Amino acid sequence: MSTPQRRSILRIIWRIVGGLALVLIAAAGWLAWWATHGGEAWLDRKAEERIHAVIEQASVPGYNFTLGRLKADARHGRLTVSDAELSFEPRLLDSLRTGAYQYLFAGKVAKAELRGLSFWRLLLHGEFRVGAIELQGPEFHYYTGPKRVDLADPFKRLGHGGNSLVSVLFTDTLSIADASATVQDLNKDLPELKVNGLSVHGTSVRVSAAGRNAGVRLAVAGTDLRVDSISTLLPDGSNLHIGAVALSRTKQNGLLTAIRITPPPTDSMSVDRMAKSVMTLAVDSLVMAGLDFDRSIADEALFIHRMGIHGLHVAVDLDKSLPEEPPEPVRLPPAALASMPFSIRVDTLALVDAEVHYRERDAKTGRWGEVPFSRMSAQFRNITNDAAATTDSITGRFNATFFDSAQVVGTYAAALDGSEKFSITTTVTRLPLVEVNRATQPLMRMQVEKGILNSLTMRMEGNARRAKGTMELAYTGLLVRVEPGTPTALRSSMFGNVMDAMLQQQYGGGMTADRERNFSIERDPDRSMLTYLWHATREGLTRNLVPEAKERMRTMVRTDLDNWKKERAARKVKK
């Protein structure tokens, strides 16, 4: 190509580039003029119209959404919403009670701000993309009915009017600060739940149309949730309070602190009081690791790899001087798990530094006895009601200090195949028996003066109807008598004089034994696992102690007979 031709082509190229530059400059100038002479206002107005249309199209029948004020700012990519409220018509409450709806939702927020909004993308492509959404101090209200709740239910009902004006809503961050929430069960199975100081931080939040008449899909990359406090009233009138809560989908962990269950005040003058267990509970912290948020929400279940309960303190009082309540069936642990309305799986449950203090008031003595457990720790595995886990078993081991002195260790296993079969082994070692006076004196008028329980081992196997097992019991120097001050008639009915005579030094003094006995018991349907174990323990102790008492009676008879013979022989010698 000759030099003149090349110069001609270059001149043409430069003219084209220059022309394009002039066009761009002109377009930029026109855009600047347009923006300063009502263009931005037009863009703001069109964006507001589009948003109002989207809200109208997305509305679910029976729900009403109102906006106090919607202000678009195209120059700064900002959208501000004031006094927004979502409510539902009262007639929907009947639909909730009949099961037509699974739950209802209402809420309002004084101010919501969206920053980094692309207005042109919204108008041209129907994509609502923002850098951040912030809601300050909103209020949320949930109402549930008799049906099992599907959290995705409202999303399925959106977009049934056809093609959506907005196909995608995406934000880099979603922040909800200082919110409050209530959950109310219209079926009256659960009391109202109050949540205060709720904060949520989500990242890469995306809501997209799933297809014509197919609702919408929600996807979130990461979520962190914090709560200042949660409170509610339990069915028995006790107050449940939970302090700070922190849950993280990103880290798959959770923390609940300062959990408290406080019974209602006791009205000593009430004629309706019944003999029932009154429990006070406190937990320092509940720590969850491996918390599967996605499966928990998608499957309406609770999946946790490890849960730790730290600083559990339980106090239970039972006043047996009051009339007994009508018996109600009580399920053993596997059956109780199976009856839960949602799926649960906890791979490992650990109990750290727990205390249990049981008090009981006897109807005859009118006094309170106590049984304390301290420094308790335990670990249980495979706690689940998953139908696919029927070939598995719940297993666990535990240890504690009994009456502030003896050591208790044990194991537990329960089948998950519906048979309710279980096995438990418990060993108690080195208990100074005078410690049990805190229970035996006020409840039984029996006083232990000395003796050591060297070891007690109980092995028990059973199901929800009956159990059997063995008890090995070894004790040294047991000396027990009817409590001083017991009325004479009552002391006689308790064979107090016989007991005093049996344990005299001439008959051997304190009893010592090392034996093993079998036992079998039937379970009342209203008996919990703990009372089931106490029934077995009492039966095992009876079968071990009665033979020793009978042997001591025979020793008394033989000794008295020998003494009588010696005295008779001595009298004959004197004659």
Predicted region positions:
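Interface amphipathic segments
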Residues: E192-K194, V207-A246, L256-S268, R367-M444, ...
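N-terminal type II signal-anchor transmembrane helix
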Residues: S2-P61
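Extended terminal
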Residues: S2-G18, A413-A415, T427, M444-K575
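Long, K/E/R/D-enriched contiguous segments that form extended
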Residues: L322-P323, E328-P334, A338-V346, A350, ...
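Flexible, surface-exposed loop regions and adjacent strand-edge segments
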Residues: K147-F155, L322-P329, M444, T486-S492
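Short secondary-structure subsegments characteristic of cysteine-rich extracellular domains
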Residues: I133-Q136, M307-G311, S374, N454-A464
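Flexible beta-edge/linker motif
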Residues: A53, A58-K147, G159-N187, T203-T257, ...
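Short amphipathic alpha-helical linker/capping segments at the junctions of internal repeats
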Residues: L151-N163, G197, R273-A275, E325-A338
